[in-house]
Amino acid sequence: MPDILHAFPIAVIPARVFAGVTTPAGLDEWWTKRSAGKPAVGAEYELWFGPEYDWRARVTRCDPGSEFELEMTRADKDWQGTRVRFQLAPKDGGTWVEFAHTGWAAANEHYRISCCCWAMYLRILRRYLEHGESVPYEKRLDV
C-alpha cells in the first residue's frame, strides 16, 4: 500500500502544533471548511469540506503534544479506512512534525492529487502557526 509522508519543522512549541491539528478552530484555519470533534481516542470528528464532502473520522491515537491520528470512517472511497497521523517532537525550540496518510489501496489519481494537496495544506498549517496567516478556504488551492 502506498503512503503519503512529509516531515518538516514548525517554529512553535508542540502544544501549539497539537492544538492546530486537533481542535476545530485549528483545523478550520488550514484544512477543513468546518469541523467538530475532541482529541480523545474513540471520539468522532466531523470534517466538512462542502455539501458533497461531509466526512467523518475516528480518533485512533491521541497523546497530547506528541501524537494524533484519525481513521477516515465516512469519506471518498479512496480515503475510506485510511489514517491521517501527526507525530510531534520538540526540536530547536520548535516542533519537528512527521505527517503520514497511510492505508491507500493504490497509487491512483486521487492518491497523487492528495500527495500534492497535503504538501500545500501542511504549508498553510505552518504559516498559520508561525505567522498567524489565515487563508480563506476557497483560496487554499491557490497557495
Residue spans of the language-model regions?
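Hydrophobic pocket/interface hotspot
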Residues: 17-21, 27, 45, 59, ...
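Glycine-centered tight beta-turn/hairpin loop motif at sheet-sheet or coil-to-beta transitions
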Residues: 1, 50-52, 77-79
